[in-house]
Amino acid sequence: MIYNIVIYFVLWGIAIASLFNEKVRKMWRGEREAFKILKQKVDPNAKYIWFHAASLGEFEQGRPLMERIRKDYPQYKILLTFYSPSGYEVRKNYEGADIICYMPVDTRLNAIRFLRLVRPVMAFFIKYEFWSNFLHILKYRNIPTYSVSSIFREDQVFFKWYGRSYAGVLKCFTRFFVQNEESKRLLEGIGITAVDVVGDTRFDRVLQIKEAAKHLPICEAFRTGVASSQSADVPHHDFKVF
């Protein structure tokens, strides 16, 4: 409840700031146009895998996995969303995704509308992306949802006595692929055990550029993680070679 009240205040703040700041104006316009883009481009007969990155740095962290999926599973389409203009404006013509747009503001209504329209079979949130309404509705709809290259610190609200209610947002994820052992320890401390330590996927991108990467650690962990976490309420998807 408090989160949703804050979101609406943030929404009004963005609207006002957009009158004076070009970057904020682009973000505000892009978020409002997201549904228009999706209505025009979503193929109702296709199966989409959704990647969300806040900005350019997070995009680079998710890019190795995105490109591996596109190569090995061409039957799936890729939807890529950004929060920041610094990501969207640079990568809006990226050929590795079928649809690219801003992520709508995290209201419950937007989340419901977005997921009904896209109907993703799987979702990946890169690093620090913990949007409560989207994540809770993804969980409600039994859509496997993964946090990639996430990293946690002990001073974050999730791990404080007063923030345990917000830690429920983290429990919406099917599995975490974290950067270090400390992040795994912190998550396990609040009862989240579906965690793999895979490092920073940006290093895979560097190796990929140098043509030295033959395997992506996150893909191997993903394959193992999905195999060990299948249950009756989690749809199975044919990602067998990860």
Regions found by a protein language model. Give the residues of each.
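Membrane-interacting alpha-helical segments
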Residues: I2-V6, V10-A17, N21
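Active-site and donor-binding regions of nucleotide-sugar-utilizing enzymes
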Residues: A15, L19-A212, P217, T224, ...
